[in-house]
Amino acid sequence: MNVTYKRPFALYVKKAKKPLQLKIEDVVLDIQKNPALGEAKVGDLKGIFVYKFKFNQQEYLVAYQFGKDQKHLNILWIDFYKVGAHENFYDELKRYLKEVKQ
């Protein structure tokens, strides 16, 4: 399986304190085991999944996308787009996706 960490995701993890980095690492491993854990988004974010978790009484979200092999339904790739607190999360994610598509 090919796993890619997009720039906003990697920068957030790099700047986070070590305990949060370890929690994000655990979440990423859980998502790799079962990509359908997250909630599928609709509308502007169609195709994106968001997984929510709590750390130190704060809710965090992880946005990702994955692709399957159509014949065997094996997971071929996962792209992790963004991780962060709920505040402005979806607005920033939409802005990033719009910039990438241009």
Label each region the model flagged.
Residues 55-61, 65-102:
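Enriched for short, Lys/Arg-rich terminal
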Residues 29-56:
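A short, surface-exposed loop/turn module that caps and links secondary-structure elements
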Residues 1-27:
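Arg/Lys-rich, positively charged N-terminal/basic patches that mediate binding to nucleic acids
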Residues 1, 49-51, 62:
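Residue-level detector of beta-strand structural context in well-folded domains
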Residues 7, 43-46, 82:
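A general secondary-structure junction signal
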Residues 12, 27-30, 92, 96-99:
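Residues that form generic nucleotide/phosphate-binding pockets
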